[in-house]
């Protein structure tokens, strides 16, 4: 009986995974347009960013999620968006594996 309970509690840990960041729907990345898409549209599409920062005086938002699995490899996707002084997308970069 003790062996069974040990297996029941340890098995999920063996199959476990870890996640860092905040998942986001990457389906709308194709709709981002430089000098057109606004911060409000980005929030509507992706939610609140995982990180906010500043790059050369411009607002920069990062959407990032990394998922590690005990069995398998790392799943990762990231979207970095730089906004101009009118709160429109100046540039962006999306990567996933």
Task: For each feature predicted by the language model, list its residue ranges.
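Positively charged n-region of N-terminal signal peptides that target proteins for export
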Residues: 1-4
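C-terminal motif of bacterial Sec signal peptides marking the signal peptidase cleavage site
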Residues: 13-16
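Residues within mature, well-folded domains
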Residues: 18-97
């Amino acid at each position: 009986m003790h062996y069974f309970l040990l297996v029941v509690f340890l098995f999920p840990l063996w199959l476990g995974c870890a996640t860092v960041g905040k998942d986001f729907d990457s389906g709308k990345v194709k709709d981002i347009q430089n000098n057109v898409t606004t911060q409000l549209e980005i929030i509507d599409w992706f939610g609140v960013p995982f990180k906010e920062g500043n790059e050369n005086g411009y607002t920069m938002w990062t959407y990032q999620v990394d998922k590690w699995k005990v069995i398998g490899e790392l799943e990762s996707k990231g979207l970095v968006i730089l906004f101009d002084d009118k709160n429109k997308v100046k540039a962006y970069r999306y990567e996933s594996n």
